[in-house]
């Protein structure tokens, strides 16, 4: 029997944080101050845990990893310390724990001493048929009390955690610092990116969420540089360098030398995820959003997915896809590149078994493919986590009559090995860490063999919104 989902209320979180600072039983040296911890790059047999220290006077402490919450029968995993100075802490260190040889489809717990208890929790995936839930959303940079603050401490993160997803896909605007500065020397801007991340991960509700839910994080403009930042932004190299050391991620096939896009590919069960970078290679003058190298990579990966006959492909594209040609939002200014991708998807007969997960627009809206003239696949816009409402793009076939702050979505997959059922569902935070499904944003695909079919959804008679109504 599987164990119940990991839960840690606020008071216990503060208690555990205090215990986290303990250095008894050989865990940490006196004066060390662990600040944050998050997990990513999860597979069926491995994961990566990163821990940030304001300073680390002794050697990197080993991580205790166990399948038990009390860390009994734990194995010891040594960490690799990487100097990562920030604007506010010259002695800041990030310790990477590369966890390998894990059992598939198993829940793991980690901490630094037996007395500290569980500080991180994740579940490995499985190869072959595997049922899971992935939550996805974007745009978190405000609170109810301070709407224009740079970071979020909203309880929307508690609401997502309550659904117990296997992974959270953050599609950009992790914060709204809109950093800018001289490109060289690199260190000052890198330090500012790291200080921004430290502030995000010091927010109570986000900190707790990322300790129990692995992340897949792709930046957008406000957390990559200033508003509408692209390849020409002086922040590009600093953002790329800090991402490599401070963010848990899957292999970066185009960025091995810290100079390419942070494009990633991974599988959860029989679902193939392709994550594209919409900022670091965007060149408006050349009318390319992906850049030549990333565009070629995506064409190749789409072909590989078709050849591998994966039942479902999830393309994480951080910006709106369904926009009018020439529209300044999302793909509108890159219509030729978008059309070429649409033709490739159509020629591979992938349209029925591809879903796009998108952010940037501060709205919750799905399209069943009827308004997607470039590929005809399902598109799911999800957000804002904690930001003002600002719709973009469209029309969309499935959209609520009103938009609110505190919105996110889930991709729930049930896979029998013969039939894979994928359900996209929008959710809205009600406050106090509770959420409700938004009935207008629900789509379900039934996939078997090389085809997926849309199932009757609510509302079945959803009509497209009038064209030309987006800002």
Language-model features: locations:
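Metal-dependent phosphoester/phosphodiester hydrolase catalytic core
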Residues: 4-471
């Amino acid at each position: 029997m599987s164990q119940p989902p990991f839960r840690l209320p606020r008071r216990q979180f503060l208690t555990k944080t205090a215990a986290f600072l303990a250095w008894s039983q050989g865990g940490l040296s006196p004066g060390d101050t662990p600040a944050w911890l998050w997990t990513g790059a999860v597979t069926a047999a491995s994961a990566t845990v990163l821990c940030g220290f304001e300073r680390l006077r002794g050697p990197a402490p080993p991580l205790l990893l166990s399948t038990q919450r009390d860390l009994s029968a734990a194995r010891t995993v040594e960490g690799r310390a990487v100097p990562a100075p920030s604007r506010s802490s010259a002695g800041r260190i990030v310790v990477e724990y590369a966890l390998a040889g894990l059992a598939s489809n198993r829940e793991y717990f980690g901490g630094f001493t037996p007395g500290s208890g569980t500080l991180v929790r994740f579940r490995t995936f499985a190869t072959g048929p595997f049922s899971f839930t992935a939550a996805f959303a974007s745009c978190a940079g405000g609170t109810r009390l301070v709407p224009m603050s740079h970071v979020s401490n909203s309880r929307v993160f508690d609401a997502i955690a309550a659904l117990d997803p296997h992974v959270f896909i953050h599609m950009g605007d992790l914060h709204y610092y809109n950093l800018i500065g001289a490109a060289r020397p690199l260190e000052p801007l890198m330090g500012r990116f790291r200080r921004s991340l430290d502030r995000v991960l010091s927010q109570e509700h986000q900190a707790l969420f990322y300790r129990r839910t692995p992340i897949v994080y792709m930046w957008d403009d406000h957390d990559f540089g200033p508003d509408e930042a692209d390849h020409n932004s002086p922040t590009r190299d600093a953002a790329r360098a800090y991402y490599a050391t401070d963010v848990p991620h899957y292999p970066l096939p185009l960025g091995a030398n810290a100079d390419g896009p942070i494009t990633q590919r991974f599988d959860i069960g029989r679902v193939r995820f392709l994550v594209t970078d919409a900022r670091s290679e965007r060149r408006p003058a050349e009318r390319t959003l992906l850049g030549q190298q990333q565009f070629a990579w995506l064409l190749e990966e789409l072909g590989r997915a078709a050849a591998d006959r994966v039942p479902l492909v999830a393309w994480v594209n951080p910006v709106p896809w369904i926009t009018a040609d020439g529209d300044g939002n999302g793909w509108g200014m890159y219509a030729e590149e978008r059309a070429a991708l649409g033709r490739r998807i159509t020629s591979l007969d992938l349209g029925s078994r591809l879903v796009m997960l998108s952010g940037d627009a501060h709205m919750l809206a799905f399209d069943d493919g009827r308004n997607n003239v470039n590929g005809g696949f399902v598109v799911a816009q999800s957000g804002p986590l904690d930001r003002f409402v600002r719709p973009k793009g469209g029309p969309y076939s499935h959209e609520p009559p009103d938009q609110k702050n505190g919105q996110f979505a889930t991709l729930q997959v049930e896979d029998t090995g013969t039939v894979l059922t994928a359900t996209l569902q929008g959710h809205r935070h009600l406050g106090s860490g509770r959420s409700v499904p938004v009935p207008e944003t629900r789509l379900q695909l039934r996939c078997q063999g090389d085809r997926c079919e849309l199932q009757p959804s609510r509302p079945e008679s959803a009509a497209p919104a009038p064209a030309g109504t987006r800002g």
